[in-house]
Amino acid sequence: MSSTEMKSYLSLIPISAKVRRRQNRMTILCIVLAVFLVTAVFSMADMAIRMETSNQLNKNGNWHIMVKDISPETAAELAAQEDVAAFSAYSDINASLTENYFAGDKRAALVGADDAILQIFPGMQCSTAPADGEVLVTANIRDWLDVTVGTAIPLTLPDGQTISLTVAGFNEDTSDANQYDAVVLVMNRSTFSQIAAQVEESFETQYFIQFKPRTNLRQSIVNIENKYGISEEKISENTYLMALNASSNNDYIVGLYAVAAVLAGMVVLAGIFMITGSINSNVAQRTSYYGMLRCLGAGKNQVRMLVRLEALFWCKTAVPAGCVLGIVSTWGLCSFLRGFIGEEFSSLPVLGISPVGIICGSALGLITVWFAASSPARRAAKASPITAATGNAVENAADSPCHARLFGSRAELSLGVSHATSSKKNLLLMTGSFALSILLFLSFSVLLRWVGFALNPVQSYAPDLSVAETSGQNVLDPVLVEQLEALPEVKHAFGRMYCPLPAEYQGKQGSIDLISYDTIQFGWAKKDLIGGTLPQEPEDGTYPVLTVFDKSNSLTVGDTIQLEDAKLTVVGVLNDSPFSSTDSPIVICTEETFHQLTGQNRYAVIDIQLKDTTADAAIAQIHTLLSDTLNKQVVFSNRIEGNRMIQSTYWAFHLVVYAFLIVIAGITILNIVNSISMSVSARMKQYGILRAIGMDDAQLKRMISAEAGTYAVSGLVVGIALGLVLNRRLYILLITHYFGAAWQVPWGCLAVIVVVVLAAVVLAVYNPVRRILMQPITATISEL
């Protein structure tokens, strides 16, 4: 381009970009990586939300709240609300499967609902709502009956009567029904009421409400409470769906919102620090170039605009490349999860495009680059014309006296530290960049621990099959356990006894849920101890017991529990157990202690673990054995599919988090390498002078190593200090408050962090030193 064609100094931008293609490569790479990181994280989060929304709609239904204990008149008014899209009454009989309702040979739960139930539960496949005498039935009924739409099925009632119902459609969500080896029959309220009247069964009516799209869900709920005087206790939320809509007021979900916001903020900050540090170093290399422009008559404002637009010029390729890389990586991860992990991810979009991810990534790139270039632009504008003659200025080149005293005769080490600390802003950016990477690493590592607590089926005590007598009493003969253990397909069989007892503890009257463990269960419980020890033999007339941590359970090691004629002492606290939390503390004792306290020695439930969970014939054999032995008065639970899905989710979650941690580690290494390389390039002339006056190759290596080491140490100190604080806070919020496990210093993570940073420093030093040593001293001195 000739001088007559150049309309302004801005015309130099594409020329400079072409000439300095190699020098700009690392800066562009930093922008690409930052945009990629944000795009991938937010895109994957968007895909996960879409998947979970679809899963929850099919599994739990498309309803937002459920209201109970209201009059029919209030229900009619609620259904007519402008913001209500669907409204259905809902009643059920035998939801616990403890009564003798049978569809064929399988236990049945009955549901009565309005026509809108089809809209609220999209998994129900039926063109029209069931008419009188018709039912929607869970699709698992086809596993043992030849049933199609229009087929009549027999429903046996507890009084022995049998009525015939016609199948109008199927509910494809069979996870709960399969787990309990049962079927669910959904019918209109007229048919349901007739059956209830026939067997003189009482029932409660609840009401599902689905709000219209773009409704302020929280405000609508508050309006209903205020207008109709309905208390919060009478309104239940669809927690998952409300959470996915960012509308839940559940304390735990709100806490997860805060955690997600903090982690997302750190991801964005990591990108900002990376881009800012890179641009800062890039401009520092070219001080003499800007001084030359000042010699040619460019004003300070022109130089400032030149630097900013030059930075945006890099975004022309870097931002699209980062977005594309983020989208492709999201596609790859989604494809892997959907194709190789399991059915849980079958609704995950494979080739989905996330506007949220693209907008966040692009905005981060453009906005950060613009603002990140502001300070370097001001520095470039201050470059005096004389800089063009003297070359790139070296800030505070003189060694600090404290550095000299620290390293004594090792002048090269003092110089290296001085180079790192001479620019306070550059040191801050480098330290901040490393520290944020460490913060992210320590923060996301908490999620790996959290998922281990949250997903119970991955625990060693998780059963594949369970059986309980329909009354829920301790009536299962221990001989059954011996018979099951003798089967070659069974890995473990174990039972538990249960008894609620009135008790006095911590100065108050209440009750406890007493549960027995055998030897193998105590062996599994040992790893879940968060305080105390396992119970041994009774001493001094008191029985040692365990309790399970829960927010509502204040029992701790050393507390005593006074029963009517016995005294218990809590000797240990578990952070996890197979039991659902109740209002009463869970207390665990040995089978011998249970027998002495209650006089009972039969089990309430028997759990079975199989050697091969795919052996359908073995499962059928066990099912037949238990049903025949107990005369079918049992609730048989098959948890294999549910365990498999949650196990897949567990490993998939680990895969995603580990992949993200690897990306963080990779970006940290590249950032350190890039920053050191650009810092060395900015001082290339100074290094040439030092070599000319006698600095040998070994001293040069030590000097650059000292500079890189200073950045690494400052980043490690700040990152680990802040990271441990955040790690502890997240751990307490996500785990300690809900599972009771105490926080411990994550020494393993800290070791990985130190190794990664040290490896990055070694890599960062190698290339710049090699580049300097390969150049003649005269070429180094004359380089701009």
Which positions does each model-derived feature cover?
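Short helix-loop junctions at transmembrane helix boundaries
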Residues: 48, 252, 323-360, 646-653, ...
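Interfacial "coupling" helices/loops that link adjacent transmembrane helices in transporter permeases
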Residues: 20, 271-315, 668-710
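A cross-kingdom feature of multi-pass membrane systems that activates on extracytoplasmic/periplasmic
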Residues: 201-202, 210-258, 620-650
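N-terminal membrane-entry
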Residues: 250-267, 356, 647-664
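Selective transmembrane-helix segments that form parts of the transport pathway or gating/packing helices
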Residues: 307-324, 397-403, 704-718
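Hydrophobic, regular-secondary-structure patches
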Residues: 30-105, 443-511
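Feature of multi-pass inner-membrane transport and sensor proteins
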Residues: 1-26, 285-302, 329-359, 367-452, ...
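Short beta-strand boundary microenvironments
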Residues: 96-152, 166-175, 192, 199, ...
